[in-house]
Amino acid sequence: MAKRHLLLVTTCLWALSCALLLHASSDGFLRVNLNKKRLDKEDLTAAKLAQQGNRLLKTGSSDSDPVPLVDYLNTQYYGVIGLGSPPQNFTVIFDTGSSNLWVPSAKCYFSIACYLHSRYNSKKSSSYKADGETCKITYGSGAISGFFSKDNVLVGDLVVKNQKFIEATRETSVTFIIGKFDGILGLGYPEISVGKAPPIWQSMQEQELLADDVFSFWLNRDPDASSGGELVFGGMDPKHYKGDHTYVPVSRKGYWQFNMGDLLIDGHSTGFCAKGCAAIVDSGTSLLAGPTAIVAQVNHAIGAEGIISTECKEVVSEYGEMILNLLIAQTDPQKVCSQVGLCMFDGKRSVSNGIESVVDKENLGSDAMCSVCEMAVVWIENQLRENKTKELILNYANQLCERLPSPNGESTVSCHQISKMPNLAFTIANKTFILTPEQYIVKLEQGGQTVCISGFMAFDIPPPRGPLWILGDVFMGAYHTVFDFGKDRIGFAKSA
């Protein structure tokens, strides 16, 4: 039987000059220290593009192996792996939201991104095996195409043999040009893997390289800390979490998806997910992404700048009282918008139609009015539960129409008001997971000054897959996360 390992991946902050210092610590882990570079507002664009491009659009042992990882804007975590014999080094994003491993190929001749990053040369590897199957992966802001090959992958000093991966011969996105990473190492389920290539954790499992069939993330969100965090294959480091993990079963294989409950603002329900929403834990997403109807309420609660929607204000002004009266009369909320004439079908459409239809003036029409109406129903129904007066309810809905999240995802807040902002909490497995303002507000530099942005962005997915939350690095920074592929479950515990 092959020797089983606990593979530790140590994450550190980005350095323009990466002076590497390797040493074995008292706990048996081999760690890598990196210098760090303080980032500014200009880096947000690159991080945002990387985050958008990184979304795939598809229906305890004494042994340790170190890999230096980089924390880019506290949002993208990536590190160096080796490919081939002898190893050719590549910087890759460790992404739980996709499943393929790909790197630029030496046969990539016509994409600028390839010339700006390391390229894999099969002629220099004695362990290379040809495959040749062509493939293409489409992302949120571009695509890569190429062909499959097989070779050994070095993660730390652990060798995964004959891993199937993609040699990218074309990269059609500015994301890949400006990104500080060469490729992506997907950690999702094989169900979303292009070409049925096994994700690397599955190969580790089949080759009996792991102490346990799990991997775990600890992301250090402290911008002043020397370490960016740890990714551990085969176990979890008890120094990086407090108490026991709360586990939830994977509800749908592909992404690391589970059934989540409500989002609470200062202990009060936002209503939209009161009966449950799907959620995905995704290390490749920078922020927290969720339904527009909820993010608008979050924006209002924290004083974030937003987009004023004339369609929204029109619906509240002309139909708000009618919606309110129907809800008071116990009308099924899914039928309210069709009864007031703004939606064609009962419950056939959802707020999850896309934020563009709500705030983009160039996309007016019945779709926009229906989407706004459905949001208004959620807001008004939620306020009725709080026993608010009619005047307060309609005034609140009108205020939310001025706080709709920007389509580009960035919502600025006052840095001086952070201490006065409410706690937010996700309900998972009937337990509340609190995020403090210090945890969900992201600080960055712009012209020597600190700028604060909300960690929440609008991201609408229509039924049947939605509504959907994506819990990215903002959430994973607060909660140590275990991905248990042996038992198909996800665990959360407060980060230490």
Swiss-Prot record:
<feature type="signal peptide">
    <location>
        <begin position="1"/>
        <end position="24"/>
    </location>
</feature>
<keyword id="KW-0378">Hydrolase</keyword>
<dbReference type="InterPro" id="IPR001969">
    <property type="entry name" value="Aspartic_peptidase_AS"/>
</dbReference>
<keyword id="KW-0645">Protease</keyword>
<keyword id="KW-0064">Aspartyl protease</keyword>
<keyword id="KW-1015">Disulfide bond</keyword>
<comment type="function">
    <text>Involved in the breakdown of propeptides of storage proteins in protein-storage vacuoles.</text>
</comment>
<keyword id="KW-0325">Glycoprotein</keyword>
<dbReference type="Pfam" id="PF00026">
    <property type="entry name" value="Asp"/>
</dbReference>
<dbReference type="InterPro" id="IPR033121">
    <property type="entry name" value="PEPTIDASE_A1"/>
</dbReference>
<feature type="glycosylation site" description="N-linked (GlcNAc...) asparagine">
    <location>
        <position position="387"/>
    </location>
</feature>
<feature type="active site">
    <location>
        <position position="95"/>
    </location>
</feature>
<dbReference type="InterPro" id="IPR001461">
    <property type="entry name" value="Aspartic_peptidase_A1"/>
</dbReference>
<dbReference type="Pfam" id="PF05184">
    <property type="entry name" value="SapB_1"/>
</dbReference>
<dbReference type="GO" id="GO:0006629">
    <property type="term" value="P:lipid metabolic process"/>
</dbReference>
<keyword id="KW-0732">Signal</keyword>
<protein>
    <recommendedName>
        <fullName>Aspartic proteinase</fullName>
        <ecNumber>3.4.23.-</ecNumber>
    </recommendedName>
</protein>
<dbReference type="InterPro" id="IPR007856">
    <property type="entry name" value="SapB_1"/>
</dbReference>
<feature type="active site">
    <location>
        <position position="282"/>
    </location>
</feature>
<dbReference type="InterPro" id="IPR021109">
    <property type="entry name" value="Peptidase_aspartic_dom_sf"/>
</dbReference>
<feature type="disulfide bond">
    <location>
        <begin position="108"/>
        <end position="114"/>
    </location>
</feature>
<feature type="domain" description="Saposin B-type">
    <location>
        <begin position="307"/>
        <end position="407"/>
    </location>
</feature>
<dbReference type="InterPro" id="IPR008139">
    <property type="entry name" value="SaposinB_dom"/>
</dbReference>
<dbReference type="GO" id="GO:0005773">
    <property type="term" value="C:vacuole"/>
</dbReference>
<comment type="similarity">
    <text>Belongs to the peptidase A1 family.</text>
</comment>
<feature type="disulfide bond">
    <location>
        <begin position="343"/>
        <end position="370"/>
    </location>
</feature>
<feature type="disulfide bond">
    <location>
        <begin position="312"/>
        <end position="401"/>
    </location>
</feature>
<dbReference type="InterPro" id="IPR008138">
    <property type="entry name" value="SapB_2"/>
</dbReference>
<feature type="domain" description="Peptidase A1">
    <location>
        <begin position="77"/>
        <end position="493"/>
    </location>
</feature>
<dbReference type="GO" id="GO:0006508">
    <property type="term" value="P:proteolysis"/>
</dbReference>
<dbReference type="Pfam" id="PF03489">
    <property type="entry name" value="SapB_2"/>
</dbReference>
<feature type="disulfide bond">
    <location>
        <begin position="415"/>
        <end position="452"/>
    </location>
</feature>
<dbReference type="InterPro" id="IPR011001">
    <property type="entry name" value="Saposin-like"/>
</dbReference>
<feature type="disulfide bond">
    <location>
        <begin position="337"/>
        <end position="373"/>
    </location>
</feature>
<dbReference type="InterPro" id="IPR033869">
    <property type="entry name" value="Phytepsin"/>
</dbReference>
<feature type="propeptide" description="Activation peptide">
    <location>
        <begin position="25"/>
        <end position="59"/>
    </location>
</feature>
<keyword id="KW-0926">Vacuole</keyword>
<dbReference type="GO" id="GO:0004190">
    <property type="term" value="F:aspartic-type endopeptidase activity"/>
</dbReference>
<feature type="disulfide bond">
    <location>
        <begin position="273"/>
        <end position="277"/>
    </location>
</feature>
<keyword id="KW-0865">Zymogen</keyword>
